[in-house]
Each structure stands twice: as structure tokens, then as C-alpha cells.
């Protein structure tokens, strides 16, 4: 199976295409009164049947989770560490991405197209 050339979307800029291979995501601190943290980019796009490889980079001190429940993805990335996640996007739809450790402040979505 081929590794998807994922398109990453930053809402204000619209879709952009990434080179074929692994996609890097990082946890970032958004300065707000609630000290919100998000995975960036928050949206990941794939096609049904594609193999997806995500590189999760946590440059913050605290551990953070990364969960896409619909695909059995559930990782904890320790502070200052990196983890790789691989799965097959075997169903189409929009699926929530959250931090299972801090669900109130880390959200995103995986969009799998037919």
C-alpha cells in the first residue's frame, strides 16, 4: 500500500499539499487565559484505503496524548519526545482527533475522502 501524500489544512489558508511520506505534527501552546494547547496542523486529510504515517513531536515539558478512536490510534508523547503513528484510513468520514489526557484543550480532525 502506498503512503499517502497528505494534504494539511490550516483553516485560514486553505488546503496545501505535502510531499509523499510522513507528516509531522507538533503540540503548540496557544496563548490564552486558559493556556490552550493544540496539535498543529489541527486537520489531516487522507483518502480511503491509504496508509497514513504521522510523526508526533512534543517540544513542551508535559506529556500529551493523541487519539483518533475510529482508527485505534491512542498514543502518549512524553515531553521533549517524538512518536510515530501508522494506520490505514479504511473508512471515509470526518473523525475527531483529541488528547485523551487533556481533552478540553487539544482537538482536531482527520478527514478521510472516498
Show the residue positions of the predicted features.
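Non-catalytic surface loops within mature trypsin-like serine protease
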Residues: 29, 58, 70, 89-91, ...
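N-terminal post-signal-peptidase region of extra-cytosolic proteins
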Residues: 34-43, 68-71, 80, 84
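Non-cytosolic beta-sheet module surface loops
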Residues: 56-58, 101
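Sec-dependent N-terminal signal peptides
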Residues: 4-13
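N-terminal edge beta-strand
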Residues: 20-51
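Extracellular/periplasmic metallocenter environments
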Residues: 18-19, 23-24, 77-114
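Histidine- and aromatic-enriched segments that form or immediately flank copper-ligand environments
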Residues: 59-81, 109
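Residues within well-ordered beta-strands of beta-sheet-rich folds
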Residues: 53-55, 86
Amino acid at each position: 500500500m502506498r503512503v499517502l501524500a497528505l494534504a494539511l489544512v490550516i483553516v485560514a489558508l486553505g488546503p496545501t499539499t505535502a510531499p509523499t511520506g510522513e507528516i509531522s505534527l507538533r503540540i503548540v501552546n496557544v496563548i490564552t487565559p486558559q493556556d490552550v494547547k493544540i496539535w498543529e496542523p489541527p486537520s489531516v486529510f487522507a483518502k480511503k484505503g491509504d496508509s497514513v504515517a504521522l510523526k508526533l513531536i512534543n517540544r513542551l515539558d508535559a506529556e500529551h496524548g493523541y487519539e483518533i478512536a475510529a482508527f485505534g490510534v491512542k498514543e502518549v508523547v512524553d515531553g521533549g519526545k517524538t512518536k510515530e503513528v501508522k494506520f490505514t484510513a479504511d473508512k471515509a468520514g470526518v473523525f475527531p482527533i483529541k488528547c485523551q489526557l487533556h481533552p478540553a484543550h487539544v482537538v482536531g480532525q482527520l478527514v478521510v475522502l472516498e
